């Protein structure tokens, strides 16, 4: 079924669904790019409760320029998954999956600190995923001593860089970050 009309009006009138996918326009009325969620059309933050009242899951495509942690905070405890998608080592998409059941949809603000999302970093055929709660509290970056024998210098792919999950890289791959202000590993 194809419906031509105002998407927000359709959202208000539609029957409940399992999933709603929303790709807000990231250009203003003058054609300039916008990055903040509330500057996009429609404003997914303003529609959060309505979206979650109409679907168990809501997938929102956002600007890859956004700080995903702030976006998660902005959606106040409703974000179950963060997908950072890159191709050719260039970050292309930031997708948030909201779960209405997890936050109760009516008391999302009360649930804000009760759960952290699962983060998926994808770059072509490379994938790294982790539970944000396990790795983003008290990040320690570049604390480990460097190994005596240095054979490789590694730079994470764009999705991992965007996620900022350098402690996950250290834990999963036995790599050591060369310094607190560096994103290079040995």
Predicted regions and their residues:
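Class I S-adenosyl-L-methionine
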Residues: 21, 26-186
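S-adenosyl-L-methionine
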Residues: 1-21
């Amino acid at each position: 079924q194809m419906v031509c009309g105002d998407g927000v009006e359709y959202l208000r009138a539609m029957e409940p669904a399992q999933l709603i996918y929303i790709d807000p326009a990231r250009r203003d009325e003058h054609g300039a790019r916008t990055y903040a969620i509330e500057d996009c059309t429609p404003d997914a933050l303003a529609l959060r409760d309505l979206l979650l009242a109409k679907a168990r899951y809501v997938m929102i495509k956002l600007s890859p320029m956004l700080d995903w942690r702030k976006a998660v905070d902005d959606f106040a405890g409703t974000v179950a998954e963060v997908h950072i998608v890159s191709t050719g080592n260039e970050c292309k998409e930031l997708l948030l999956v909201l779960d209405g059941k997890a936050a109760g949809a009516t008391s999302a603000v009360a649930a804000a600190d009760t759960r952290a999302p699962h983060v998926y970093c994808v770059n072509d055929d490379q994938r790294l995923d982790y539970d944000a709660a396990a790795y983003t509290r008290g990040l320690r970056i570049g604390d480990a001593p460097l190994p005596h024998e240095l054979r490789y210098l590694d730079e994470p792919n764009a999705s991992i860089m965007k996620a900022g999950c350098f402690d996950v890289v250290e834990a999963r791959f036995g790599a050591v970050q060369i310094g607190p202000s560096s994103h290079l590993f040995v």
